[in-house]
Design a protein with these regions (language model features):
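RNase H-like two-metal-ion nuclease catalytic core shared by retroviral integrases
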Residues: 67-69, 75-82, 89-113, 125-128, ...
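Active-site beta-loop-alpha junctions of metal-dependent nucleic acid enzymes
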Residues: 36-60
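Mobile-element integrase/transposase regions
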Residues: 1-27, 33, 46-49, 175-192
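Short, surface-exposed connector motifs at secondary-structure boundaries
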Residues: 31-33, 59-64
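C-terminal domain-tail junction helix/linker
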Residues: 87, 109-197
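Basic, flexible linker segments flanking DNA-binding modules
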Residues: 1-9, 96-97, 151-160
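Short catalytic-loop micro-motif centered on adjacent basic/acidic residues
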Residues: 37, 63-68
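Short small-residue beta-strand/loop micro-motif enriched in glycine and branched aliphatics
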Residues: 33-37, 91-92, 116-117
């Protein structure tokens, strides 16, 4: 199952490449277009900076960000940044990584087709530059069986006519009355429901 519209849902995840190197990955559910960057940590500042990289890379408005329950996604600064860009925050259920399957699978591809070819013990390498080169190859030259042999850029070209304009995305965001979610938001939801009785 895939979304039909580019930017309708973007899956995010973070994986450790080595000590002091974390790969942030964003993959568009529809086109499989990706943004990857390497940061020295997975703190709020890195997550917010990565969101800017996503918005600069993807040539379409991002409507929803889907993540796991990592603390890097559940900080208020990151969620306020999402609000500032009219992006809905959609965390998956706890302990269900398969719901973020596209980003998880793409990170496995990174491990086998990219990181395994690099001497990660060499601290002089600029892993971020190398990851960006890999991203370019992945998006423009690497065919994907899930896209019937197309690259993510070829898929994007075939569905570009479906991409909404930013004012429409912004209007839908405000209609949805999005809230900032604390990490224990399910408990808060339970309390609110109980107090209504």
């Amino acid at each position: 199952y895939s979304k039909e519209i580019p930017g309708e849902r973007v899956q995010l995840d973070v994986m450790k490449v080595r000590n002091g190197a974390y790969q942030f990955t964003a993959i568009d559910d529809c086109t499989r277009l990706r943004t990857i960057r390497v940061y020295p940590n997975k703190k709020a500042e890195s997550t917010i900076h990565f969101l800017g990289e996503i918005l600069n890379t993807f040539p379409f408005p991002v409507q929803r960000i889907q993540t796991d329950w990592g603390t890097e996604f559940f900080n208020y600064d990151f969620q306020y940044e999402l609000h500032d860009h009219f992006i809905k925050f959609r965390p998956i259920k706890p302990r269900t990584p398969h719901l973020n399957g596209k980003v998880e699978r793409s990170q496995q591809t990174d491990k086998t087709e990219f990181w395994n070819l690099i001497d990660l013990s060499d601290k002089t390498l600029d892993l971020n530059v190398m990851a960006m080169e890999w991203q370019e190859f992945y998006n423009k030259k690497r065919p994907h069986s899930s896209l019937n042999g197309k690259t993510p850029m070829q898929k994007l070209k075939s569905v570009k006519h479906l991409v909404p304009i930013q004012p429409d995305v912004s209007e839908k965001f405000w209609e949805s009355n999005e809230e900032i979610l604390p990490r224990n938001y399910k408990y808060l939801k339970f309390i609110k429901h109980r107090n209504k009785k």
